[in-house]
Each structure stands twice: as C-alpha cells, then as structure tokens.
Amino acid sequence: MKVVIGIDPGTAACGYGIVHESDGRLRALGHGWWKTAAGQRPELRLKTIFEGVAALIEEHAPAAVVLEESYVGADARIALSVGQARGAVLVASAVAGVVCAEYAPARIKQTVCGYGRADKSQVQRMVKTILAMPQEPTPSHAADALAVAICHLLGSPLLRATA
C-alpha cells in the first residue's frame, strides 16, 4: 500500500492529486487546486502553496511527492513563477522528510495515455479511466497532478529510483 501526492506547480493555480496504490490497483483519494490572486504579493502566493502541500503531507503521509518538470517556454516570467512554486513544494516536502521525484511532461503523457504528445482532454479521460473515477477530474491542473502521481506509481522501479 502506497500513497503518492502529485503536484502540477504554478503560482496562479497549483494542482494537486492524491493517489493510493494497493495490490496494483490505483484510486484517487482526492484532488483539487490552490488558486491565488494575481495581485497578491508573491511571498503570500508561495506561502499558500507551501502550507497546502504541508497539510496534504500531514494528512496522507505519502511515500513521495511528485512534480511535473518545468517547461521553459518563451515567457521567462512564467518560467520563473513556476520555478518558485516548485521551490515551495520541494521545501514543504523536505521539511516533512518526504522524497520528491520529477517527471517530464512527455513521459507523464506516455505513461498515462500511451502517447507522449497527448492533449489535456486525453489526459483527463485516461486519468478517469485508470483511477475508475465517476467523472473526469477538473480543473486540468488537478488532472495533471493525478497524472504525474499515476506516472510515478506505474513507472518501472528502476526509473523511479533515478527520477
């Protein structure tokens, strides 16, 4: 039996998903997101994420906290913001003594959908199917967080050890 918390980092919207594995079966224990106001001071936005992750860790005692690796696109401001959110998650995990792993978006999509360039709707459908959920998880940030947790749990043990 193992619990993994997946995180889709971002400062405006940070998704989370908690997945439980027992005897090879996966089920969602919960999912959601933290939304912060655009006008809020950056340190307060990061505090919201840090406290949210810390509360999830305390409640679920996960074996790991897993994140989607940062994608550095054309907008440096967004990349910096996502990096700050990732930092809040990593520190919350380190304070609690929980191992962290990171996965590339293409690897997550390949594991969950069988196709590394799957779109958001395909990821949501497959997360619903894999976790036997009654409906597709929303918002997409939460679905992405569940997907990274699934990736960690379904990936090979050797790959998890090097993630």
Where are these regions (language model features)?
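Phosphate- and other anionic-substrate recognition elements at nucleic-acid/protein interfaces
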Residues: M1-A163
